[in-house]
Design a protein with these regions (language model features):
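Active-site microenvironment for binding and transforming phosphate-containing groups
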Residues: 1-273
Length: 273
């Protein structure tokens, strides 16, 4: 997947709410995986000052509008209070954002019935689907979470739902959503070296020749080592204005990686056309 180009090589902002969407067949039915664009609006409450009622209302309205496009009940989507951890929660209970959002950086729906969201603006929004059980997951994989094992923990939680004799990677599919790329994620040399000692694929150099981290490559290394079929949505948040980026425009907002069960009677428009 590449960025649509506008005048003078700038990224074109699409009218639709998604920068990428796919439908996946599982043993228990079809599910959608998708990543929103800036056209869907800021979906993160924490970007808005807590005393700014109008801004908080805009986030709530954006979430409701997105759920209408997804074809799921209002308030059904589980959002997380993300803290750059390796903690995974089950997607059961209320968890409707705000104060009730569980503190974690990954969530698993045992049967895929709960719509899941993970919010980012340079970190990786990873979606995982188990085609054999229908279970679904999302994970927030920034530098800290990736190195601390959030993806391994997510895969382990999904595999725990299988019979003990079948707890291996085949049947799991993962999508590494848009994030800051190795050409743009400049870090101190010591930070790059420490990360590369843990995940060699993360070592990179920026397009201007300084030390960098390639988080998508590191995430792919982790997932493929666990036998997970992995695809990367090859779009850099810093380079592509269809997406929020903390490095390009701090504080503007967060987009979401999503997974939800398909309604056979609903038509979900594509946002990457």
């Amino acid at each position: 997947v590449t960025a649509a180009e506008g005048p003078a090589g700038t990224a074109r902002v699409p009218a639709g709410p998604f920068v990428h969407r796919e439908t996946v067949r599982t043993a228990t039915g079809a599910v959608h995986v998708a990543w929103t664009s800036v056209a869907a609006g800021n979906l993160a409450l924490h970007v808005v000052p807590p005393d700014e009622a109008e801004g908080l209302a805009r986030v709530s309205a954006a979430r409701r509008a997105l759920e209408r496009v997804m074809g799921v009940p209002e308030g059904a989507t589980l959002y997380l209070d993300q803290v750059h951890s390796a903690d995974v929660v089950w997607a059961d209970g209320p968890g409707r954002g705000g104060a009730s959002a569980p503190v974690a950086d990954a969530a698993v729906s045992r049967d895929g019935s709960r719509p899941l969201a993970v919010m980012v603006a340079d970190c990786l929004p990873v979606v995982v689907v188990d085609e054999t059980t229908g279970a679904t997951a999302v994970a927030h994989a920034g530098r800290r979470g990736l190195l601390d094992g959030v993806l391994e923990a997510t895969v382990d939680r999904l595999l725990s739902l299988r019979p003990e004799a079948d707890r291996t990677g085949p049947g799991l599919r993962a999508w590494i959503g848009p994030g800051v790329c190795g050409r743009c994620y400049e870090v101190p040399a010591a930070m790059r070296d420490d990360a590369a000692a843990c995940l060699p694929a993360t070592a990179a150099t920026t397009s201007w020749g300084t030390p960098a981290l390639d988080l998508p490559a590191g995430a792919a290394e982790v997932l493929r080592a666990r036998g997970v079929a992995t695809a990367t949505i090859d779009v850099c948040t810093r380079e592509d204005e269809r997406l929020f980026s903390h490095r390009r425009a701090p504080g503007e907002g967060r987009f979401a990686g999503l997974v939800w069960r398909a309604d056979p009677d609903a038509t979900v428009p594509r946002g990457d056309a």
